[in-house]
UniProtKB/Swiss-Prot annotation:
InterPro entries per the UniProt record, alphabetical: Vasculin_fam (IPR028128)
GO terms under biological process: DNA-templated transcription; positive regulation of DNA-templated transcription; regulation of DNA-templated transcription
Positions of region (Disordered): 92-115, 160-191, 237-271, 292-318, 456-475
Function, as annotated: Possible transcription factor.
Source taxon at top rank: Eukaryota
Residues annotated with Phosphoserine modification: 49, 76, 202, 383
Name of the featured protein: Vasculin-like protein 1
The entry's keywords: DNA-binding, Nucleus, Phosphoprotein, Transcription, Transcription regulation
Length: 475
């Protein structure tokens, strides 16, 4: 928590005295330096910088009362509470122990101060004001024993200058644990419960603890909800838990190749029956790859469960959509190919003046190379009806590269007229009625004859332009 970062430990006390002392200390710092009142320890003060600002002169007297020498203390953030000895007017010791209680061996900064200077190990040095020290060595040893017991405990009131009665009576000590414990677990109501929640979740499911670590202290209910929701979601989504992968290399192999066949059995159990596998595999691979880092033992962690659920939902919708689009595309493909076949038959026969025709059964023969080559290329792209036409032309004696064939002869005017009349009859009567192309072609053209007749009657003699535009659109 931010408020515990670099704040002294005495700010954690909830009593109003300490709050008053913490605020008033910093407010009245300079004021107390210049002012000498007739109270004990009035100039005793925290001094948080290391500029050696000490009172090295003799004992001050204001009126006829003693004052404690201005003993400033420089301490680090967690050095504990370090107190010096001071005496009252009668010379009796007050309840303040004269030893430093810091856990890091922080001794009192008394660089030439008139009071007694005492190191943390109990060695005793008399400086200028030896008369000011009235302790016997036995008392010092007793205090040393006490300090070993109470070494890391804090006095609640650290500033007797702000509370004049504090010097005349012993203040009860209030232990709050070691300073390291204070910094790691500050004494607030939220912190222990938060640590406890995370510990519980991490025993049940490490992935849930990973997600709960990001929730703030006010969202503990959410953290518990995650841990309680996980089993029900797990049962709903994965009815039969898949066996964990034997090697972690299986995940890496699946990441390297996103092929539909490379699905492992456990992932197929988690992702139910993928129909169009290629899209969800990439998502699932990304999802599953996060899983072994967090919990390789659990079959499907909750992160994967949620995203696999998403992929399942999206896959159902995309299946419906893709099936609809696929059927629509097939229907359009068949319609376009059928109309294209009709146009192509007419175009081939109308432009037959440029192509030689051998007199086999009076049917159409060789084509020119310029017409045959695009037809061969389109045959790979277009549907089965065009392949049927291609097979028909081959059976009638057509060759793919007929320029090397010596039997190809140019068409005459009579043959061209006969070709036009036959195509007109085909358009009016249908493909089969007058006996033209009856024997071989009737079985091949029969599946799409009815639709093709209507389309051919609608489009009179638009031949090459429509077919090329259709081809460009579908290539």
């Amino acid at each position: 928590m931010a408020q515990h970062d670099f704040v002294p430990a005495w700010l954690n006390f909830s009593t109003p005295q300490s709050a008053k002392s913490s605020t008033a200390t910093f407010d009245k710092h300079g004021e107390h330096l210049s002012r000498g009142e007739g109270r004990f320890g009035i100039s005793r003060r925290r001094h948080n910088s290391s500029d050696g600002f000490f009172n090295n002169g003799p004992l001050r007297t204001t009126g006829d009362s003693w004052h404690q020498p201005s003993l400033f203390r420089h301490d680090s953030v967690d050095s504990g509470v370090s107190k010096g000895a001071y005496a009252g007017t009668t010379g009796n010791l007050s309840g303040w122990h004269g030893s430093s209680r810091g856990h890091d061996g922080m001794s009192q900064r008394a660089g030439g101060s008139t009071g007694n200077h005492r190191h943390w190990n109990g060695s005793f040095h008399s400086r200028k004001g030896c008369a000011f020290q009235e302790k016997t060595p036995t008392e010092i040893r007793e205090e040393k024993k006490e300090d070993k017991v109470e070494k890391l405990q804090f006095e609640e009131e650290d500033f007797p200058s702000l509370n004049p009665e504090a010097g005349k009576q012993n203040q009860p000590c209030r232990p709050i644990g070691t300073p390291s414990g204070v910094w790691e677990n500050p004494p607030s109501a939220k912190q222990p419960s938060k640590m406890l929640v995370i510990k519980k979740i991490s025993k049940e499911d490490p992935a849930a603890a990973f997600s709960a670590a990001f929730t703030s202290g006010s969202h503990h209910a959410n953290g518990n909800k995650v841990s309680t929701m996980v089993p029900s979601v797990y049962k709903n989504l994965v009815p039969k838990p898949a066996p964990p992968p034997s090697k972690p290399n299986a995940w890496k192999a699946n990441r390297m190749e996103h092929k539909p066949g490379s699905l492992s059995s456990s992932r197929e159990a988690a992702l139910t029956n993928p129909v169009s596998v290629t899209k969800p595999v990439v998502l699932a691979a990304g999802v599953v790859l996060n899983a072994p880092k967090e919990s390789p033992s659990s079959t499907t962690p909750p992160i994967e469960i949620s995203s696999s659920r998403l992929t399942k939902l999206t896959r159902r919708t995309t299946d419906r959509k893709s099936e609809f689009l696929k059927t629509l595309k097939d229907e359009r493909n068949e319609d376009c190919s059928q109309s294209r076949d009709c146009d192509k038959l007419e175009g081939l026969r109308l432009e037959g003046s440029h192509t030689p025709e051998p007199k086999e059964n009076g049917e159409q023969g060789c084509l020119q190379n310029g017409l045959s080559l695009p037809m061969v290329e389109e045959r790979e792209v277009l549907s089965h009806s065009l392949e049927a036409e291609h097979r028909l032309l081959k059976a009638m004696g057509w060759q793919e590269y007929p320029e090397n064939d010596e039997s190809c002869l140019p068409l005459t005017e009579d043959e061209l007229k006969e070709f036009h009349t036959r195509t007109e009859q085909l358009r009016r009567n249908g493909f089969v009625k007058n006996g033209f192309l009856q024997g071989r072609s009737s079985s091949l053209f029969s599946p799409w004859r009815s639709t093709c007749i209507a389309e051919c009657e609608d489009s009179d003699t638009e031949t090459s332009s429509s077919e090329t535009s259709d081809d460009d659109a579908w290539k």
